[in-house]
């Protein structure tokens, strides 16, 4: 009984360890790779999307309800700290919060109803 338990434990450890193989190295994106902003508007009104970073405010465009807008962030806005996205509808606005971006990443900005439920995530 003790031997079977030891063999079972050893087998499980070998199985778990085989999943820890070497990962392929991913090289960083070139410094001139664009940063894409993908905005999905789940809100009930058209939203104007603005990016603010490095003391620059840049209007990206308008995304209508139920639509997806894809934009490219100007290179001058990257590297000097964080970037924040805002979606504005008159007096109401959604914000992404500060995002630390690097060349080649994609930002998914989901505008939700109510606006304080909006989210942003960064992916490679």
Task: Mark where each language-model region is.
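Bacterial N-terminal signal peptides that target proteins for export
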Residues: 1-8
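Short beta-strand/loop motifs in extracellular/secreted proteins, especially
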Residues: 45-49, 81-83
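A short, solvent-exposed beta-strand micro-motif common in secreted/extracellular proteins
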Residues: 78-90
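Short amphipathic beta-strand segments in non-cytosolic proteins
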Residues: 50-57
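Exposed aromatic-hydrophobic patches
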Residues: 68-76
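Asparagine-centered strand-capping/turn motif at beta-strand->loop junctions
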Residues: 39-43
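Extracellular beta-sheet/turn segments enriched in Thr/Pro/Gly and aliphatic residues
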Residues: 21-28, 93-124
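C-terminal motif of bacterial Sec signal peptides marking the signal peptidase cleavage site
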Residues: 15-19
